[in-house]
Amino acid sequence: LGKQVIAKFKLDQGKDPQSYGIGIKELWEIDPARHKAGLALHSAGWPLDENTYGGSFLYHMEDNKVVVGFVVGLDYTNPWLSPFEEFQRFKTHPNIRWYFEGDEAKGIAPGKRISYGARAITAGGLLSLPKTVFPGGALVGCDAGYLNASRIKGSHAAIKTGMMAAEAAYDALQAGRSHDELSAYPEAFENSWLHTELNKARNFKQWFKKGRTVGTLMTGVEQFLLRGHI
């Protein structure tokens, strides 16, 4: 629906073309001996090649549950590459499979996959962000493209943009307005910590088009040394 709205109102006019990734996620239940509640792990690259963007996440939830996932940029050039198979290869890494495999000698049971799924994600960042308001409505969260691809994070952005849009809608209703544009919403975004965060990461995908080594180096320089001032 969001893509239809963007096309109908030409909200992406003058913006960089959006780029996408595919995220694959599994929910596991693992042995308590290998569960560390609150542990969060991220990785970039392996098993992907130098010129293919991607990374992973592994989160330890409560009740011995673990969420593990892998994201691959859909601009990869190898026609034989399978994001699903790359995800399965990723889980064979010694530091990752340790959480899922059992050890009969130590009485550790192997993990059990409970559920799985996949979805496309927007990865273009701030430079691909469309106009987020139109007559009578607004775009928030991943539908607009607020994902911070450099950190594989989007939930916090979805919550924040939802709050800002709701506040703008409330003010409009209190003023007796209807079916116009909630201009207060994009204004609030531009003055928020979220805009600052996404602005620092705005060139992330552009750098990684030059390969993982250059992308990692320049992203580090831009985000941590120059604080996005480039």
Region roles according to the model:
Residues 1-229:
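Residues forming the flavin
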